[in-house]
Amino acid sequence: MATLRDIRRRIRSVESTQKITRAMKLVAAAKLRRAQERIVAARPYAGKMAELLGNLVSSAGAHDEAPHPLLVQRAGPRRQVVIITADRGLAGAFNSNIVRRARDFIRQSSAPDVTLVVVGRKGRDFFRRRGFTIKRDMLGFWDRLAYGHAAEIADFLMRQYLDAEVDEVHLIYNEFRSVAVQRPVLEQLLPIPRAEAGEGRATTVDYLYEPSPEAILGDLLPRHVRTQVFRALMESLAGEYGARMTAMEAATKNAKEMIEVLTIQYNKARQEKITKELLDIVGGAEALKQGAEA
């Protein structure tokens, strides 16, 4: 049975852990608010760009005519997967869900040659240990995430695609739904999907473009790819903070419950010790009394 000293030590240890989890929850909540604000601010821009892209593709000609190399559909087997995870843990199933989704996609892929671009230390370490081919990784920028980081990743992916080193590029990340819900998402990034590029989309306004739609596409399509990568990074960052906030809230609650249980154990053990000491005193007094009478 645990001694009073052991129970006190455990209570102090759990209280110390509770302080840490509570602080981590507060930090994650503050960062989550800022991340949510960035997502809300970015959505109108991304939506308008998608609308303009659809009109431009329609104006430049049928999609099958491939008005830009980033729209070219190739039948090759080389596939690249961009996997976005966090650098740190303590975020519930945030990283494991992405890793599981990526492994399932790779297993089900008919492409014999699959290479990875991994964002985040957790994903990099996991796939490196299992011998996957990692073309590139990016780590240590999450606390200062900027558009430049997304542009660096997107430009690397576009170079790979335009140089015909890969035939498809897919993106796997956690989409932020709410503080408690992050959904693993798989999207095709390159070639830009037909629906995303506006095929079949009704054009309600007939725009006149200067310069030509083809010339504008040459600038807009790379911007679109960079924007999609940046959006995925922001979604993942907000999801990480939400998952960590939820996990730390649960850990803080569990610590509180454990402290209550340990406190009850401590009080019972202390009461038993006091009762035993009283019985010893009473027993000793009785023995002395009987000795005196004899």
Model region roles, listed by residue range:
Residues M1-A294:
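C-terminal beta-strand-loop-alpha-helix "lid" module of Rossmann-like NAD(P)-dependent dehydrogenases
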